[in-house]
Regions:
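General beta-strand structural signal in soluble alpha/beta enzymes
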Residues: 27-28, 46-48, 121-125, 163-164, ...
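Active-site-proximal betaalpha loop/short-helix elements
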Residues: 98, 176-243
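Glycine-rich anion-binding loops of enzyme active sites
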Residues: 2, 45, 52, 85-171, ...
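Acidic, Ser/Thr/Pro-rich beta/coil linker or hinge segments at domain junctions
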Residues: 3, 260-296
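Residue-level signal for inorganic ion chemistry
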Residues: 35, 75, 83, 122, ...
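Helix N-cap motif at beta-to-alpha junctions
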Residues: 249-256
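Extreme N-terminal cap/leader segments of soluble proteins
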Residues: 1-63, 82, 91, 106-115, ...
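Small-aliphatic-rich amphipathic alpha-helix that forms the alpha element of a beta-alpha
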Residues: 64-88, 109-117, 205-211
């Protein structure tokens, strides 16, 4: 059955009753606006929106459940980069009228599965038809304690640069199945002083310079130390993108303890020092090939 045969109201009737609601949801999906009761003790409200567009972030032949998973996890990876806890999500789906209803159902199943992984309540959204490709926008709201918020703009000269996991070759499978490093980020900010952090969505060659520019510093990188996925080369680690790992800067005074504690807490996930932040006037980093840049 096509979407044009089912119609918006009947489609929403099929989808909305399955969406996960937490105890803090007062009025959820289906109303004009969602109403939530934020938990006490959180200092900052955190908001993020992200999109997934057919032909850019996924191909139509991709498994719809995997596409739904990725669409939800993309903004959650940004929450990991700020050490924030996601709690509510809004979904906007734009699809051609000829889209199979079964595809949409599987897509929403992927959304629900990803949301449940981090106890996120899907509280509403919007649907619309289009003559173009399928596109989805996911907006997420959450919270973070004031003393645990991390941005990309507070890196300091002399900081060590670390990256979680392994880089390169994500397009083969990982980009549809990754899990944001929220648990790892929360552990880091609870136990260590993290000066700056960013998630590697567009590639190390794009995201590392972004962090350095935001912090008004330069960087030097040890290419031989980059942790590579199986079959990936240094160029892949720098340029492929879609890794969704964390890149962060912290004081070298805590590096030994950080690495030792990390291995004990996350023995199956590598943490690698790949370089350091230096004064802008002393930049010695190679000209990194860029990752993915929209509109170019």
């Amino acid at each position: 059955m096509k979407l044009r045969q089912l119609g918006e109201d009947r489609l929403l009737d099929q989808l909305l009753h399955r969406l996960p609601f937490g105890k803090t949801v007062v009025v959820g999906a289906g109303a004009d606006c969602a109403l939530v009761a934020p938990p006490a003790g959180r200092n900052f409200l955190v908001l993020k929106t992200d999109c997934a567009v057919e032909g850019i972030h996924f191909l139509r032949r991709a498994n719809a459940l995997d596409v739904g998973w990725k669409a939800m996890m993309r903004p959650l990876s940004d929450f990991a980069a700020t050490s924030a806890l996601p709690q509510f999500a809004l979904i906007t789906l734009i699809a051609p009228k000829e889209t199979e209803v079964g595809w949409v159902r599987e897509f929403y199943r992927g959304l629900r599965k990803a949301a449940a992984r981090f106890k996120v309540s899907i509280v509403g959204g919007e649907t619309s038809s289009t003559r173009g490709p399928i596109a989805v926008s996911v907006s997420v709201v959450g919270f973070v304690e004031k003393n645990r918020w991390v941005s990309r703009c507070s890196g300091k000269v002399g900081d060590d640069l670390f990256v979680t996991g392994q880089l390169g070759g994500a397009i083969k499978r990982k980009h549809l199945h990754f899990v944001p490093r929220i648990a790892e980020s929360r552990w880091l900010t609870k136990n260590f002083s993290i000066h700056a952090m960013i998630d590697l969505s567009d590639g190390l060659g794009i995201d590392l310079p972004r962090l350095a520019r935001a912090s008004k510093v330069g960087f030097e990188i040890e290419l031989e130390n980059l942790p590579l996925n199986r079959g990936a080369k240094i160029g892949n680690a720098i340029s492929d993108g879609e890794d969704y790992e964390l890149l962060f800067a912290s004081s070298p005074r805590q590096s030994k303890r950080l690495l030792r504690s990390w291995r004990q807490k996350f023995p199956r996930l590598p943490l690698t020092r790949i370089g350091s932040l230096i004064p802008q006037s002393a930049v010695r980093n190679p000209q990194l090939p860029g990752g993915y840049v929209h509109f170019q």
